[in-house]
UniProtKB/Swiss-Prot annotation:
<feature type="transmembrane region" description="Helical; Signal-anchor for type II membrane protein">
    <location>
        <begin position="5"/>
        <end position="25"/>
    </location>
</feature>
<feature type="glycosylation site" description="N-linked (GlcNAc...) asparagine">
    <location>
        <position position="128"/>
    </location>
</feature>
<feature type="glycosylation site" description="N-linked (GlcNAc...) asparagine">
    <location>
        <position position="74"/>
    </location>
</feature>
<protein>
    <recommendedName>
        <fullName>Probable glycosyltransferase At5g11130</fullName>
        <ecNumber>2.4.-.-</ecNumber>
    </recommendedName>
</protein>
<keyword id="KW-0328">Glycosyltransferase</keyword>
<dbReference type="GO" id="GO:0006486">
    <property type="term" value="P:protein glycosylation"/>
</dbReference>
<feature type="glycosylation site" description="N-linked (GlcNAc...) asparagine">
    <location>
        <position position="243"/>
    </location>
</feature>
<feature type="glycosylation site" description="N-linked (GlcNAc...) asparagine">
    <location>
        <position position="281"/>
    </location>
</feature>
<keyword id="KW-0735">Signal-anchor</keyword>
<keyword id="KW-0808">Transferase</keyword>
<keyword id="KW-0333">Golgi apparatus</keyword>
<dbReference type="GO" id="GO:0016757">
    <property type="term" value="F:glycosyltransferase activity"/>
</dbReference>
<comment type="function">
    <text>May be involved in cell wall biosynthesis.</text>
</comment>
<keyword id="KW-0325">Glycoprotein</keyword>
<keyword id="KW-0472">Membrane</keyword>
<feature type="glycosylation site" description="N-linked (GlcNAc...) asparagine">
    <location>
        <position position="356"/>
    </location>
</feature>
<keyword id="KW-1133">Transmembrane helix</keyword>
Amino acid sequence: MADLTCTTPFLLYPSLVIILFFYSINHHNQIFSSVVDDDPSCRLSSSPQAVFSSFRIFPFRSSSSCLNITSNNNSTSEVVVVEEVDEAVERIEEGLAMARAAIRKAGEKNLRRDRDRTNNSDVGVVSNGSVYLNAFTFHQSHKEMEKRFKIWTYREGEAPLFHKGPLNNIYAIEGQFMDEIENGNSRFKAASPEEATVFYIPVGIVNIIRFVYRPYTSYARDRLQNIVKDYISLISNRYPYWNRSRGADHFFLSCHDWAPDVSAVDPELYKHFIRALCNANSSEGFTPMRDVSLPEINIPHSQLGFVHTGEPPQNRKLLAFFAGGSHGDVRKILFQHWKEKDKDVLVYENLPKTMNYTKMMDKAKFCLCPSGWEVASPRIVESLYSGCVPVIIADYYVLPFSDVLNWKTFSVHIPISKMPDIKKILEAITEEEYLNMQRRVLEVRKHFVINRPSKPYDMLHMIMHSIWLRRLNVRIPLSQ
């Protein structure tokens, strides 16, 4: 057996944090422990074999002894009675089982369609083109999500460290999602934890770094890690929800570069926890079967949901374009080979004043999207908005929504080692192939637009769908 414990006392935190943001925690600061079953059959599978091949969903955990959590001995009146929790779990799991069956049936229908060469007009908004791994299963899964998916946000903690995030600029997805679920009229907002499919830990990573770390005298992640870890300690002592699943139906969401480091302090505690991250680097611990890859999007003020058409394909005479700072090793290599060296592949570190960044993307067939300090880049979404085929230059990057989107049909991937051959690779793409990719860019970009309130198949819905898929891969057992 292994105990998951938090050892950092709250008295070590700055008084500002204690007074303003953790006023309730000192009443519930006993560290929780959970019993982790060492039976190999109960461990989360690392096998990539898919239950739904179109989604790359991984094998369900069905053993009744899995996720066996001991109840907290120090229960209070705020802790939900186990019998009531079991009834709620049973009801939710029955609904999820029905959803899985419906999605499987849709997948079988897709196989019959392929055999019979019939059309897929009944799929509706996701019917056209080949941007999806399986349009039928995606459409059915989205329908099931709208019917059954509910998110409960824990109420503990106060703004700005919790329940508040940026609504604009590079980390805006954190605040937009949080605001949609907490303050909007989202259909996915649970009325009570008993009807929740998943549980949202509303930690504001950006604001923690902004308010706790300034002035920046140290970039050590321990303060960030301790705040999140102690928050989990609080909610796991107060409620049974974390303990019954070992966090497998809990998630947090952040686009900040530091967000992946939250779990580094205690890998066992976060072993099953869903992390929704922009920095989806599989070489640095991002696990596609558990974690969610977020699109990185830069939202200017007053431009929410902004998409422009760009030039039609026949007017795009420039082969490829990139302009951006020398952030990280990938871009240094890009500049070494291509910076202001070719008239067909225009690469700038500092864009000349005579050029307009957006208009240059509008004129290019392909837009280079090299990694910066981390693997993700907002240029992928910017390319889609401009109708420019994104050229993703990154290794180990798990692309957003790759459970349902077939990125190969509307983007080009060039490994870092092949950067000297960028022009050769792009020129080898035929005009017909390019036109097909560009058409699919226009089709798929609806999934990368943020609307408030969220709309079916937009970016926020797609993020929720990614979380929904991870929840479909979990079966929570009833108490023994």
